[in-house]
């Protein structure tokens, strides 16, 4: 009985009390009966390092008890990192599910209501007769669930090759790589005269000059689409044009059936279909690759939870960043990736493929913690640095991410310095913090965190890196690919369908002229389109501003401000100021005299810290 009470106490810490009805308990994944009587103890009134705690014995006993009750369980939603189990782990999972349901309830109800209104409006206007009619999906609709609306230019410029290519440098930057002039081979050939006409040079010269880039979704060929739906497994070649200095598409290869290769010189509808097929693959990738942005911070937090006292300053910050984090896998398994669930209802490839994909990435070495540091990752793919080719003239994702991470890093540096004392060149305070060192050892040991800094942690810069990366994932990287991004950018129809509804062509010229017998045959019908937008709208979190849950609010929890002293409060004030400046610049974006924003014919705002939640929201 005592262990059950302790589990509930630990699970409730840092979370406001929630009244749980019996039906909620029954509906939330076998919530234990004792959780319905959860009481909440206050968060620590003072965060302190273990060596400064006057009650180290009780502190150590509390950690030992957590280790007994919070265990590493099997991975769920693909074979990646451990998911919590044990009495405390199960209670925390159930607690987070309830928090998630509470946060999502209004968004879900609003999106469903707006979906019904949108469908009624579309049908009253005669439905989709041309591609232009997809504007009926958005014009005047989704004002509450997606108050910022879809990206300016995403509809009006949807046939633009520059829009298509620049999405790789903004909405989905995690799959693009530059082909190294000597280390990478050309993935497929493109007819020489076509390359010459498009680029005024040769494919080999582009490669040798470091001007050739690849997105490879050929791995999707191993998955079988659902009945009545279809999918290619596209590879896309892109190039940096030496004349215009623009990043442009060169060719798309389908890798299925007769394996057609399309280029911008093809019939305009054939080429547009190729881009649609590519984007269908890309949407699958972004939605399932982002699962790693859940599992990586989860396992880092799990290791910390088993080794750090709740009174440790670092634990306080990590708990804040991991608000409701353990809801996503059980909720996803229950309603999104279950057979016939929301995924199967909307996407071409089945939920079984979606679950398999992140595990496949992880099995092939993906999901490394330090490898995911922003600049290290981008440099490894040749997107920054000039070792393998000329600099990209515009890289919207990196431009915004670099500034946001800079603000996070400044906060974390000040937080670490205020916690461990002014940095005088002696980082011995880190080595004396046995809880911190136990965390690093746990992460490298039982937790099996891939590519985590080695134990012992000797330099506070390493700790700053770790904390910065966790906060960047929860409040930045995740939202580039999920949260509000799909409904505003990467999932906007007609260019980004979740499923294709006609077979992949066996010859060019099969697209007609944009009538229902042409391109519309591959695209969702009116009801399917509304269902796609509704699902993606439910990923958005429109209320976080009113709830003080944005990235700007990440470190402003009252218990953290009260329990960490004036240095922490000053760091938070600086962070709020920095992110406010970033937010105002992003929110104020529009088109320049050339009709471009950050070099793109659409306005990208996915990293606005005053709009995004600070946590892993969905």
From Swiss-Prot:
Please describe the post-translational modifications of this protein.
N- and O-glycosylated.
Start and end residues of each stretch annotated as Disordered: 36-58
What EC number(s) are associated with this protein in UniProt? 1.13.11.-, 1.13.11.45
Tell me which residues are glycosylated: 60, 91, 106, 116, 157, 513
Bias kind Polar residues: ranges:
46-58
Annotated Low complexity bias: 36-45
Name the consequence of residue 347 to L/V: Changes the stereospecificity of the enzyme from 13R-HPODE to 9S-HPODE as end product from oxygenation of linoleic acid and to 9S- and 13R-HPOTrE from alpha-linolenic acid
Segments forming a coiled coil: none
Cofactor binding note: Three His residues, the carboxyl oxygen of the C-terminal Ile or Val residue, and a fifth residue, usually Asn, ligate the metal, which binds water to form a catalytic base Mn(2+)OH(2) for hydrogen abstraction.
Which amino acid positions bind Mn(2+), per UniProt?
290, 294, 478, 482, 618
Report any one BP term from Gene Ontology.
Answer: lipid oxidation
* Cofactor(s) the record lists: Mn(2+)
Single GO molecular function: linoleate 11-lipoxygenase activity
Q: Which GO terms describe its cellular component?
A: extracellular region
Consequence when changing residue 347 to A: Changes the stereospecificity of the enzyme from 13R-HPODE to 13R-, 9S-, and 11-HPODE with almost complete consumption of 11-HPODE to 13R- and 9S-HPOTrE as end products from oxygenation of linoleic acid
**Keyword vocabulary terms for this entry:** Dioxygenase, Glycoprotein, Manganese, Metal-binding, Oxidoreductase, Secreted, Signal
Family annotation (InterPro entries)? LipOase, LipOase_C, LipOase_C_sf
State the protein's purpose: Lipoxygenase that metabolizes linoleic and alpha-linolenic acids to 11S- and 13R-hydroperoxy fatty acids. At the end of lipoxygenation, the intermediate product 11S-HPODE from linoleic acid is then transformed into 13R-HPODE as the final product. It also acts on alpha-linolenic acid producing 11S-HPOTrE and 13R-HPOTrE with subsequent transformation of 11S-HPOTrE to 13R-HPOTrE as final product.
Please name the PANTHER family in this protein's record: LIPOXYGENASE
Protein family: Belongs to the lipoxygenase family. Manganese lipoxygenase subfamily.
Please report the name of this protein according to its UniProt entry.
Answer: Manganese lipoxygenase
């Amino acid at each position: 009985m005592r262990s059950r009470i302790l589990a509930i106490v630990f699970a409730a810490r840092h979370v406001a009390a929630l009244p749980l009805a019996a039906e909620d308990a029954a509906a939330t994944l076998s919530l234990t009966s004792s959780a319905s009587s959860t009481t909440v103890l206050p968060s620590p009134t003072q965060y302190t390092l273990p060596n400064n705690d006057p009650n180290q014995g009780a502190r150590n006993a509390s950690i030992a008890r957590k280790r007994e009750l919070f265990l590493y369980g099997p991975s769920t939603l693909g074979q990646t990192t451990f998911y919590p189990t044990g009495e405390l782990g199960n209670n925390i999972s159930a607690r987070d599910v309830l928090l998630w349901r509470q946060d999502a309830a209004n968004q879900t109800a609003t999106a469903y209501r707006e979906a019904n209104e949108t469908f009624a409006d579309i049908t009253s206007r005669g439905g989709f007769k041309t591609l232009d009619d997809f504007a009926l999906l958005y014009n005047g609709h989704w004002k509450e669930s997606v108050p910022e609306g879809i990206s300016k230019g995403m509809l009006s410029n949807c046939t633009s090759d520059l829009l298509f290519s620049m999405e790789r440098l903004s909405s989905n930057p995690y799959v693009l790589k530059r082909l190294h002039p000597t280390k990478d081979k050309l993935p497929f050939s493109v007819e020489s005269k076509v390359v010459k006409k498009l680029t005024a040079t040769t494919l080999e010269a582009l490669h040798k000059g470091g001007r050739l880039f690849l997105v490879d979704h050929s791995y999707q060929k191993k998955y079988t689409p659902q009945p009545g739906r279809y999918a290619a497994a596209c590879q896309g070649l892109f190039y940096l044009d030496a004349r215009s200095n623009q990043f442009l598409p060169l060719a798309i290869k389908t890798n299925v059936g007769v394996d057609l290769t399309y280029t911008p010189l093809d019939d305009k509808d054939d080429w547009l279909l190729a881009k649609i097929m590519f984007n269908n693959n890309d949407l699958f990738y972004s939605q399932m690759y982002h699962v790693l942005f859940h599992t990586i911070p989860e396992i880092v937090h799990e290791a910390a939870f088993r080794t750090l006292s709740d009174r440790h300053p670092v634990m306080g910050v990590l708990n804040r960043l991991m608000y409701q984090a353990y809801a996503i896998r059980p909720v996803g398994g229950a309603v999104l990736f279950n057979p016939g669930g929301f995924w199967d209802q909307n996407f071409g490839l089945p939920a079984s493929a979606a679950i398999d994909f992140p595990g496949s990435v992880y099995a092939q070495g993906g999901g490394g913690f330090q490898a995911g540091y922003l600049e290290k990752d981008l440099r490894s793919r040749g997107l920054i640095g000039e070792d393998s080719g000329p600099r990209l003239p515009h890289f919207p994702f990196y431009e915004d991410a670099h500034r946001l991470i800079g603000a996070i890093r400044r906060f974390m540096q000040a937080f670490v310095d205020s916690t461990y004392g002014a940095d005088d060149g002696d980082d011995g305070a880190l080595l004396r913090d046995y809880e911190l060192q136990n965390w690093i050892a746990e992460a490298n040991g039982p937790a099996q965190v891939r590519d985590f800094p080695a134990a012992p942690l000797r330099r506070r810069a390493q700790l700053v890196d770790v904390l910065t990366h966790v906060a960047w994932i929860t409040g930045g990287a995740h939202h580039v690919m999920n949260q509000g991004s799909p409904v505003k950018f990467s999932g906007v129809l007609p260019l980004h369908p979740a499923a294709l509804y006609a077979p992949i062509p066996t010859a060019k010229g099969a697209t007609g002229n944009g009538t229902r017998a042409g391109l519309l045959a591959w695209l969702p019908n009116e009801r399917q389109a509304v269902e796609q937008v509704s699902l993606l709208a439910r990923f958005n979190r429109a209320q976080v501003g009113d709830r003080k849950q944005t990235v700007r609010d990440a470190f402003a929890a009252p218990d953290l401000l009260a329990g960490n002293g004036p240095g922490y409060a000053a760091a938070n004030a600086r962070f709020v100021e920095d992110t406010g400046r970033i937010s105002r610049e992003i929110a104020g974006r529009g088109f320049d005299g050339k009709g471009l924003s950050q070099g793109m014919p659409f306005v990208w705002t996915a990293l606005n810290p005053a709009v995004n939640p600070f946590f892993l929201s969905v």
